[in-house]
């Protein structure tokens, strides 16, 4: 039995938006294949996340403000910098399933759940998306808490506030 859950660096997108993006990605998969990476998929997936962090040093500045950690990530050949069309489609499909009305039916309502996000995380829409998810989970009567880490982006465990985050968890 699961004793608790920590959901970090997430957000919420309405199903109709996910459906539109999924259709676009399906068309891209038909053209280039499931495993292909393209500028189109990059822009649809994470390409817009850097907008609020200009001037950009890298295409992944949205991950964290800690430049040393970001450089380490960018120089790591095992880290894939671009998402394939197929993986992005699967991610969107999973996000869509998380938004279904029956998603939380079988959850243990007593199990503690912590939503945690950086206030500058574009995945959580700079707290708007994670706040929406929190309200949705609260309506389902889940034992939910939310923590927003200030001056932090997506990768909370590599930010200057990492120790604070770890202690909170």
Enumerate the language-model features and the residues they cover:
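Soluble, non-transmembrane catalytic domains of enzymes that act on hydrophobic metabolites at membranes
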Residues: 1-12, 75, 103-104, 132, ...
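Conserved alpha/beta-hydrolase "acid-adjacent" motif
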Residues: 122-132
């Amino acid at each position: 039995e699961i004793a608790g859950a920590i959901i970090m660096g997430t957000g919420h997108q309405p199903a109709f938006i996910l459906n539109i993006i999924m259709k676009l990605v399906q068309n891209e998969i038909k053209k280039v294949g499931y495993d292909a990476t393209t500028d189109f998929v990059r822009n649809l997936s994470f390409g817009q996340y850097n907008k609020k962090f200009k001037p950009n040093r890298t295409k992944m500045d949205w991950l964290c403000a800690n430049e040393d950690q970001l450089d380490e990530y960018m120089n790591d050949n095992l880290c894939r910098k671009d998402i394939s069309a197929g993986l992005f489609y699967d991610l969107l499909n999973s996000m869509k399933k998380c938004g279904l009305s029956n998603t939380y039916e079988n959850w243990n309502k007593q199990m503690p759940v912590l939503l945690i996000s950086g206030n500058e995380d574009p995945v959580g829409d700079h707290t708007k998306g994670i706040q929406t998810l929190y309200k949705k989970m609260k309506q389902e009567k889940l034992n939910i808490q939310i923590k927003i880490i200030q001056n932090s982006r997506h990768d909370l465990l590599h930010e200057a506030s990492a120790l604070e985050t770890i202690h909170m968890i």
